[in-house]
């Protein structure tokens, strides 16, 4: 979770998100991303972002494509908003959300990769693997 602590107003990535405070950040995961999703949800809410958590509501085993599709469908009618998708490795849910032409999901492993995916590739979904983040 070191990357979450690095976020602050002086960070260029965070500055880019400032305009997003008026839009929504959708969160989705499978059971393997449940804990990280909760941490991110609390962090975003504490920093005054509008957050909609698409689930799951419990840490029971669920299928990542179901929640990836939920996230993609929310973004379909809301091009100003973005999403964060989480599963164990990030790979499965990344494949699931990238099936839709309006989604540009980037599986990232560093703050710099996240910043560049937004800046250079106009990524609208950040994908993380809970089992791969220390």
Question: What annotation goes with each model-predicted range?
Answer:
Residues 50-61:
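A short beta-strand-loop structural module common to alpha/beta enzyme folds
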Residues 92-103, 112:
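Short Gly/Thr/Asp-enriched flexible loops that form oxyanion-binding sites at enzyme active sites
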Residues 66-85, 89:
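Short, structured active-site "lid" loops
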Residues 21-25:
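Extreme N-terminal starter segment of soluble prokaryotic enzymes
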Residues 35-46:
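Short, solvent-exposed amphipathic alpha-helices that sit
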Residues 26-28, 32-35, 111-134:
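C-terminal binding/interaction regions
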């Amino acid at each position: 979770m070191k990357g979450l602590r690095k976020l602050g107003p002086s960070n260029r990535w965070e500055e880019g998100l400032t305009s997003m405070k008026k839009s929504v950040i959708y969160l989705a995961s499978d059971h393997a991303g449940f804990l990280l999703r909760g941490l991110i949800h609390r962090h975003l809410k504490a920093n005054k972002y509008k957050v909609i958590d698409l689930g799951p509501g419990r840490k029971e085993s669920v299928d990542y494509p179901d929640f990836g599709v939920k996230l993609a469908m929310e973004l379909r009618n809301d091009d100003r908003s973005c999403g964060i998708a989480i599963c164990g490795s990030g790979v499965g849910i990344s494949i699931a959300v990238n099936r839709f032409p309006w989604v540009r999901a980037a599986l990232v492993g560093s703050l710099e990769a996240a910043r560049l995916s937004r800046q250079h590739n106009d990524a609208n979904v950040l994908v993380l693997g809970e089992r791969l983040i220390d």
